[in-house]
From Swiss-Prot:
This is Methionyl-tRNA formyltransferase. Gene3D superfamilies: Formyl transferase, C-terminal domain (3.10.25.10), Formyl transferase, N-terminal domain (3.40.50.170). Belongs to the Fmt family. The keyword Protein biosynthesis applies. It comes from the Bacteria. It catalyses: L-methionyl-tRNA(fMet) + (6R)-10-formyltetrahydrofolate = N-formyl-L-methionyl-tRNA(fMet) + (6S)-5,6,7,8-tetrahydrofolate + H(+). Attaches a formyl group to the free amino group of methionyl-tRNA(fMet). The formyl group appears to play a dual role in the initiator identity of N-formylmethionyl-tRNA by promoting its recognition by IF2 and preventing the misappropriation of this tRNA by the elongation apparatus.
Amino acid sequence: MVRVFFAGTPECAVPSLRRVACAHRVVGVLTNPPAAVGRSGKLVHSAVAREFFRLKASGVLPESASLFVPGRLDRAFYDAVEALRPDVLVCFAYGKIFGPRFLALFPRGAINVHPSLLPRWRGSTPVPAAILAGDCETGVTLQYIGEEMDAGDILAQSRVQLDGTETTGALLSRLSLVAADLVDDVLVGVERHTLAPAAQDHSQATFCGKLCREMGLADWSNPAVVLERKIRAFTPWPGLFTYKDGERIAILQARSCESSFVPLAPVGTVLAADKNGVFVQTGDGVLSLLQLQRSGKKPLFWRDFLNGSPLLLTGRLGV
């Protein structure tokens, strides 16, 4: 049985860690240090660290398995990992780039779990990128880690069909379960020496960058279909939001529809409200707002929102 060293940080990596721990031999786990959460600034362990503690307490992980939460990957860390005699690295969203010194510690290779169908959507935000682009399918790729990010040879892929209603949070949860199955299959291939790596077609590569809070500000000159995709792609973060009379309004759910309102109003204009929502003019088509949230308040469906704050959904939004 190969000796696996696992690296990951967020919740999406937990199913893969759990599967590897149950079916293979995990000698060590690497994750980011505890981070401050909430207004209190309380330090909280990563989702992967919390799962490590659960698996060890339940006896799934052996007592000899080590948890690493270094602030930086230095020589002392490399020496400690080397002492575990790992065969293979499995990495899912650890959050930092590994250098050649670290990758050389794994004689059977370093494997990355990437939630897209590489070479499409190389980069740090492949799930929201697929939603923003209106892709009909996405998936999970396992590939060798190389010098160029997400460009290594492909070991396995699993495809997932999209129906156009997915949010980033829900889709990433779904892909995390697909990834766990794929990781198990690939590690079996490592043990049996049956893997057949395939080079990526680099000419077909597309790329995605980091999200930032400012991206969540609704640009009403965008087409309605783009704004609807942004709502789903930016859930849970940074969300899509607008302003009215200086107050921030988060748009949690909406539907794009063709305009039946004439004449064409300035973008951001609230056109009407009926049983199908609150209709806002966009650069192309109309966006029907279905669920909204004022700052510091609970989410409300549009009827309840109008009952409590009718003046916030009049005139033009975002001005």
